[in-house]
Amino acid sequence: MSHKQFKSDGNIVTPYLLGLARSNPGLTVIKHDRVVFRTASAPNSGNPPKVSLVSGGGSGHEPTHAGFVGEGALDAIAAGAIFASPSTKQIYSAIKAVESPKGTLIIVKNYTGDIIHFGLAAERAKAAGMKVELVAVGDDVSVGKKKGSLVGRRGLGATVLVHKIAGAAASHGLELAEVAEVAQSVVDNSVTIAASLDHCTVPGHKPEAILGENEYEIGMGIHNESGTYKSSPLPSISELVSQMLPLLLDEDEDRSYVKFEPKEDVVLMVNNMGGMSNLELGYAAEVISEQLIDKYQIVPKRTITGAFITALNGPGFGITLMNASKAGGDILKYFDYPTTASGWNQMYHSAKDWEVLAKGQVPTAPSLKTLRNEKGSGVKADYDTFAKILLAGIAKINEVEPKVTWYDTIAGDGDCGTTLVSGGEALEEAIKNHTLRLEDAALGIEDIAYMVEDSMGGTSGGLYSIYLSALAQGVRDSGDKELTAETFKKASNVALDALYKYTRARPGYRTLIDALQPFVEALKAGKGPRAAAQAAYDGAEKTRKMDALVGRASYVAKEELRKLDSEGGLPDPGAVGLAALLDGFVTAAGY
């Protein structure tokens, strides 16, 4: 496959959303928040209320997610940067754009960053008085039940089926709990496996071939995660399918997620991961159907083929099977229900819809404004000292970014270092423009939390934002007159407890928690900031010998994580980045 790419200015997501709306009447774009919503679903549209469906996630999977906004499917989505979750603010903006008195169902793929951000947005919506349910999609079978017990199955092809079927259920007037039940039944009765000839090329990143010229990989994710195993030489499509179907259908105790019996109603989806020709994909679909019929006596009731949820230009395909009989009810009726979503096979637009675009402008809507807490905490801080400490931490991040990015290229999707740098650049700009309220300790930390959430995205952005928000609340609740080491120590412990409500990661799971908890515990034990920073560094170093249990690295083969044995093993990139940040803070503070 070609790894060449056209040059871009780095901002391709927002123009894509505008281009999609330009060719699909009835869609409105909130540019700043990268939200696309169905104009007819807005609260002021005058249309009868129905349960609204909100989804989203990282970009790079097109037509998912924005391509499934339409009548009979999703009502709104929030788009993150490539392979990075949208922020909580973006998601909340999408929820507000289609707020309904009948409630909102949030559909999210089962990835750590997505779960954190969409979960936090759901909680904020509930706190604001909205009725909200959340369904997490996990249909991957490449990771067995034992290894995936903590993180669950990755969300892959079934995400599209949930969008379509739950959207139709909502259009039929079902209540929120009923629509959520339909969505969950699709998740519970779907399985997916994918295979590829290589990893995809991420715009703006240096292309690199991960697999050898004669290698292929089974179990590939949609974020460039390594698969379950690699093999060579290259097989025929028929040989490859014969290796993939047993992972979906064999009754192995560790991998048998859904039972399929002859004569049951089964939906087959053959998904192009972005780089296969339509000719090859159609051929693969026929081979899959033949083997299902001949080897397993399964005759698909519905078959759909195309690019539904991609990994940019990934040269591979995925097989998704849904047991519609076990899912029950009107699943096939909802599957067949027409939709205007461009990512589906069936589209319909009225002349009235097209009139909106006849004026030459894409409908846009104003961004939802961030509501900052204006109530001071009374905990004073020295502005210049606070800014100096922040800038020192940012400088440390810039220093270690190349190494962190390299580590994450092996263990994840390669964005950890650049994500941290993005957060640092936003804070540097804010300090330069004096927009951070650093003279008030709690307000300053709250401002930092908002900036981190907006600028970083991804899993780390969500974790940092949650921790900082709770840290600010801990400072506010301290009742102290000024920010001291003792104030920070107590608030840090409160913040860690709050963070644990939103992540399953704990020490030993090979995440940034392996650096954060030792730092907090050292402070709590009275060892002082310098000893705490050293504890964070030591914790990050210990991850070199750990197996990942949560996050994207948990899906990567162990041999990939052992590529740096000469250094003592591959450390967790997030832990390394956090340890460097804390070292910069502590050094600038004079410890």
Curated annotation (Swiss-Prot):
<feature type="domain" description="DhaK">
    <location>
        <begin position="8"/>
        <end position="344"/>
    </location>
</feature>
<feature type="binding site">
    <location>
        <begin position="413"/>
        <end position="416"/>
    </location>
    <ligand>
        <name>ATP</name>
    </ligand>
</feature>
<dbReference type="GO" id="GO:0019588">
    <property type="term" value="P:anaerobic glycerol catabolic process"/>
</dbReference>
<comment type="pathway">
    <text>Polyol metabolism; glycerol fermentation; glycerone phosphate from glycerol (oxidative route): step 2/2.</text>
</comment>
<feature type="binding site">
    <location>
        <position position="114"/>
    </location>
    <ligand>
        <name>substrate</name>
    </ligand>
</feature>
<dbReference type="GO" id="GO:0004371">
    <property type="term" value="F:glycerone kinase activity"/>
</dbReference>
<dbReference type="InterPro" id="IPR036117">
    <property type="entry name" value="DhaL_dom_sf"/>
</dbReference>
<keyword id="KW-0418">Kinase</keyword>
<feature type="binding site">
    <location>
        <begin position="58"/>
        <end position="61"/>
    </location>
    <ligand>
        <name>substrate</name>
    </ligand>
</feature>
<keyword id="KW-0067">ATP-binding</keyword>
<dbReference type="Pfam" id="PF02733">
    <property type="entry name" value="Dak1"/>
</dbReference>
<dbReference type="InterPro" id="IPR050861">
    <property type="entry name" value="Dihydroxyacetone_Kinase"/>
</dbReference>
<comment type="function">
    <text>Catalyzes both the phosphorylation of dihydroxyacetone and of glyceraldehyde.</text>
</comment>
<feature type="binding site">
    <location>
        <begin position="511"/>
        <end position="512"/>
    </location>
    <ligand>
        <name>ATP</name>
    </ligand>
</feature>
<dbReference type="GO" id="GO:0061610">
    <property type="term" value="P:glycerol to glycerone phosphate metabolic process"/>
</dbReference>
<feature type="binding site">
    <location>
        <position position="109"/>
    </location>
    <ligand>
        <name>substrate</name>
    </ligand>
</feature>
<dbReference type="GO" id="GO:0005829">
    <property type="term" value="C:cytosol"/>
</dbReference>
<feature type="binding site">
    <location>
        <begin position="572"/>
        <end position="574"/>
    </location>
    <ligand>
        <name>ATP</name>
    </ligand>
</feature>
<dbReference type="InterPro" id="IPR012734">
    <property type="entry name" value="DhaK_ATP"/>
</dbReference>
<dbReference type="GO" id="GO:0050354">
    <property type="term" value="F:triokinase activity"/>
</dbReference>
<dbReference type="Pfam" id="PF02734">
    <property type="entry name" value="Dak2"/>
</dbReference>
<keyword id="KW-0319">Glycerol metabolism</keyword>
<dbReference type="InterPro" id="IPR004006">
    <property type="entry name" value="DhaK_dom"/>
</dbReference>
<dbReference type="GO" id="GO:0005524">
    <property type="term" value="F:ATP binding"/>
</dbReference>
<dbReference type="GO" id="GO:0019563">
    <property type="term" value="P:glycerol catabolic process"/>
</dbReference>
<protein>
    <recommendedName>
        <fullName>Dihydroxyacetone kinase 2</fullName>
        <ecNumber>2.7.1.28</ecNumber>
        <ecNumber>2.7.1.29</ecNumber>
    </recommendedName>
</protein>
<comment type="similarity">
    <text>Belongs to the dihydroxyacetone kinase (DAK) family.</text>
</comment>
<feature type="binding site">
    <location>
        <begin position="459"/>
        <end position="460"/>
    </location>
    <ligand>
        <name>ATP</name>
    </ligand>
</feature>
<dbReference type="InterPro" id="IPR004007">
    <property type="entry name" value="DhaL_dom"/>
</dbReference>
<feature type="region of interest" description="Disordered">
    <location>
        <begin position="40"/>
        <end position="59"/>
    </location>
</feature>
<feature type="domain" description="DhaL">
    <location>
        <begin position="384"/>
        <end position="587"/>
    </location>
</feature>
<feature type="active site" description="Tele-hemiaminal-histidine intermediate">
    <location>
        <position position="223"/>
    </location>
</feature>
<keyword id="KW-0547">Nucleotide-binding</keyword>
<keyword id="KW-0808">Transferase</keyword>
